């Protein structure tokens, strides 16, 4: 069995009381001493920091690079201008989802692409098969995400001029505490946020700089899951990867349940007639909703909002409704 990899922030996580867990070949923080619920609420009320160093970061730069990558993106028909970025889905020639991604056009035919750590091998295989020549920057660049209503204020307190920060759909090269950084706007959790990519040798410097503002808290994988679930964000979900990208977007919906029990991934959702109409891709209690919720895949199409459903949650039948 291969040895688990660690991010440059491992020791900082341990110092802050993180519970570390194995995930797709990495050891990452599940939650910190405050607990996942408090971390979730901190992201919604102030700001939260996320260790994204395990994610894949790639530069794709050669004549015709944008045209080559366009055909691999679900929203590839929509042009990007230099300095722009967007969330997208990498897919193969058959339209099958390979990985969610964020793609930034740094300059003409010069792209910076990030994918979740769970999907790096599949993304690299796709790039190779389509002759999208790439350079992996994952070992050389660290990435810290910050999300929440005080994200912008945090970076301003770190010395960045507010007018220099990227707006929605933008990526910029900025200086942060004397270091050059690729900073991309991000709204993955339905909160304003930024992904900050910088020299991995200076991870402690940037981590300390952000925490010294006394605004953001560090948050782990558990909070990431519930924040993304509430926001309906498509993540690196094993159930959805390998399905048609169009179906991933058109046939998935949020289902909320009464109480705190949520059905787990793979559990079938039944309608009032007892017919299986969906499968849970991920489920959890969501602190922001104050109830359990699940992201579900409806192979025959999403029923009307408010449609009642029920499912088994660890031996207990739970009732829910389809969200809007």
Predicted regions and their residues:
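Conserved, structured C-terminal
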Residues: 1-16, 104-324
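Acidic, proline/glycine-enriched N-terminal capping motif
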Residues: 1-91, 96, 221-222
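Well-ordered mid-protein domain cores that form the structural environment of catalytic cofactors
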Residues: 71-130
């Amino acid at each position: 069995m291969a040895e688990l990899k660690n991010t440059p922030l491992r020791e900082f996580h341990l110092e802050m009381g993180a519970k570390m867990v194995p995930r797709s070949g990495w050891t990452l923080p599940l939650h910190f001493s405050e607990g996942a619920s408090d971390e979730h609420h901190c992201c919604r009320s102030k700001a939260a920091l996320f260790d994204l160093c395990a994610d894949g970061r790639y530069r794709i730069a050669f004549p015709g690079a944008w045209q080559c990558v366009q055909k691999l993106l679900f929203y590839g028909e929509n042009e990007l201008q230099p300095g722009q970025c967007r969330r997208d889905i990498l897919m193969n020639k058959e339209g099958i989802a390979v990985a969610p991604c964020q793609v930034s056009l740094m300059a003409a035919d010069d792209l910076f692409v990030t994918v979740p750590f769970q999907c790096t091998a599949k993304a690299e295989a796709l790039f190779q098969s389509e002759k999208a020549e790439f350079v992996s920057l994952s070992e050389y660049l660290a990435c810290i995400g910050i999300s929440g209503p005080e994200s912008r204020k945090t970076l301003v307190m770190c010395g960045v001029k507010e007018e220099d920060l990227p707006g929605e759909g933008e990526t910029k090269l900025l200086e942060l505490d004397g270091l050059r950084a690729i900073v991309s706007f991000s709204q993955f959790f339905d909160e304003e946020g930024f992904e900050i990519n910088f020299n991995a040798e200076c991870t402690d410097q940037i981590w300390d700089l952000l925490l010294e503002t006394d605004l953001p808290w560090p948050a782990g994988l558990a909070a990431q899951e519930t924040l993304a679930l509430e926001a309906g964000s498509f993540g690196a979900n094993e159930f959805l990867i390998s399905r048609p990208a169009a179906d991933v977007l058109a046939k998935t919906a949020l289902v909320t349940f009464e109480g705190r029990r949520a059905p787990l991934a793979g559990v079938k959702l039944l309608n009032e007639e007892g017919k299986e109409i969906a499968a849970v891709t991920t489920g959890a209690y969501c602190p922001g909703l104050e109830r359990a919720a699940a992201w579900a895949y409806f192979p025959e199409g999403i029923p009307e909002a408010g449609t009642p459903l029920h499912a088994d949650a660890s031996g207990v039948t739970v009732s829910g409704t389809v969200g809007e």
